[in-house]
Amino acid sequence: MERTEFEIPGGIPPRRNGGQGRAADTNVDANLKPDEYDAEVTLRPKSLTEFIGQPKVRDQLSLVLTGAKNRGVVPDHVLLSGPPGLGKTTMAMIIAQELGTSLRMTSGPALERAGDLAAMLSNLMEGDVLFIDEIHRIARPAEEMLYMAMEDFRIDVIVGKGPGATSIPLEIPPFTLVGATTRSGMLTGPLRDRFGFTAQMEFYDVPDLTKVVKRTAKILDVGIDNDAAVEIASRSRGTPRIANRLLRRVRDFAEVHADGHITMGAANAALIVFDVDEVGLDRLDRAVLDALIRGHGGGPVGVNTLAVAVGEEPGTVEEVCEPYLVRAGMIARTGRGRVATAAAWRHLGLEPPEGTIGDY
């Protein structure tokens, strides 16, 4: 099959080895970009039956919510953990929708003081769902106040300062807390133990991601061929947010260089233009592999050294690039540093040396 049926303006972009761009420019970062919020809201499913993927989590949540509604009580507090872009925020919205209640949203970094949390809790109505994103980053004073709120539906508000300060108990209407975290290991034991239901969101397989792409295309009123949807899904790192982002970029290409309908040729040509290769790696991912293999013989190399080589911050390499490269079997973490596997060597068109990890 022809890889493309379009002439790409300026030719195929070079596979740059340097790190001139920043991570914020990448199309395969699973974190939500500031300009994507409105688009995300319109694409989010509104019910558990409409939600694609995560069948185990959906079934378990359905039981929890249905049981609570049948008993006439608020459901247990819910903790959703997993990498960014898999639907944790969407699931919180669906929980409120399924319960027929209001959703109040905040984030861990926004709750710096106990007073910040007290203000949120005091405005809740009975049965409301309070969603705290990045709950692992909540400040300790606010976290300690949250313990009592979750268990007893009350908090103690301190009025005054010094010896004259007094504690006033404040009753809170029963509510359900939904916490989301990308780093469940950073949660304290007391906080984790107060969640009655915990769920781990998993990466998507290509068939489910293909359904996501087709659903999004329908909402955006964009025609798309099945093989084009599969191609976009296969390059989306198992993440719906990335699949939706790539679909929007492919749509842009198809509208400019074709009749707006997304064919396999349009999808391939667009993804070349936007520098996303056949396994979902972008410029920065390939720069990391290139620095590791061509620059350091395959490793082991520390993350700080890799970051300098590609011109990025160590946190960017560690949080944006490395998780997928490890999951894709291209990088192995060892006690001495990062090591390129045989798959990484071959992805760059090189023959791995004898004894390389994964060379069977």
UniProtKB/Swiss-Prot annotation:
GO terms (BP aspect): DNA recombination; DNA repair; SOS response
Compartment(s) where it occurs, according to its Swiss-Prot or TrEMBL record: Cytoplasm
Chemical reaction(s) catalysed: ATP + H2O = ADP + phosphate + H(+)
Binding site for Mg(2+): 89
Cited InterPro entries: AAA+_ATPase, AAA_lid_4, DNA_helicase_Holl-junc_RuvB, P-loop_NTPase, RuvB-like_N, RuvB_C, WH-like_DNA-bd_sf, WH_DNA-bd_sf
EC code: 3.6.4.-
Binding site for ATP: 43-44, 85, 88-90, 151-153, 194, 204, 241
CC annotations in GO: cytoplasm; Holliday junction resolvase complex
UniProt region (Head domain (RuvB-H)), positions on chain: 278-360
Keywords: ATP-binding, Cytoplasm, DNA damage, DNA recombination, DNA repair, DNA-binding, Hydrolase, Nucleotide-binding
Segments for region (Small ATPAse domain (RuvB-S)): 205-275
Domain of life from the UniProt record: Bacteria
SMART domains assigned: AAA
Annotated binding of DNA, by residue: 333, 338
MF terms in GO: ATP binding; ATP hydrolysis activity; four-way junction DNA binding; four-way junction helicase activity
Main localization (coarse): cytoplasm
Catalytic class of the enzyme: hydrolase
Region annotation (Large ATPase domain (RuvB-L)) ranges: 24-204
Known function: The RuvA-RuvB-RuvC complex processes Holliday junction (HJ) DNA during genetic recombination and DNA repair, while the RuvA-RuvB complex plays an important role in the rescue of blocked DNA replication forks via replication fork reversal (RFR). RuvA specifically binds to HJ cruciform DNA, conferring on it an open structure. The RuvB hexamer acts as an ATP-dependent pump, pulling dsDNA into and through the RuvAB complex. RuvB forms 2 homohexamers on either side of HJ DNA bound by 1 or 2 RuvA tetramers; 4 subunits per hexamer contact DNA at a time.
Domain notes: Has 3 domains, the large (RuvB-L) and small ATPase (RuvB-S) domains and the C-terminal head (RuvB-H) domain. The head domain binds DNA, while the ATPase domains jointly bind ATP, ADP or are empty depending on the state of the subunit in the translocation cycle. During a single DNA translocation step the structure of each domain remains the same, but their relative positions change.
Quaternary organization: Homohexamer. Forms an RuvA(8)-RuvB(12)-Holliday junction (HJ) complex. HJ DNA is sandwiched between 2 RuvA tetramers; dsDNA enters through RuvA and exits via RuvB. An RuvB hexamer assembles on each DNA strand where it exits the tetramer. Each RuvB hexamer is contacted by two RuvA subunits (via domain III) on 2 adjacent RuvB subunits; this complex drives branch migration. In the full resolvosome a probable DNA-RuvA(4)-RuvB(12)-RuvC(2) complex forms which resolves the HJ.
Family note: Belongs to the RuvB family.
Protein name per UniProt: Holliday junction branch migration complex subunit RuvB
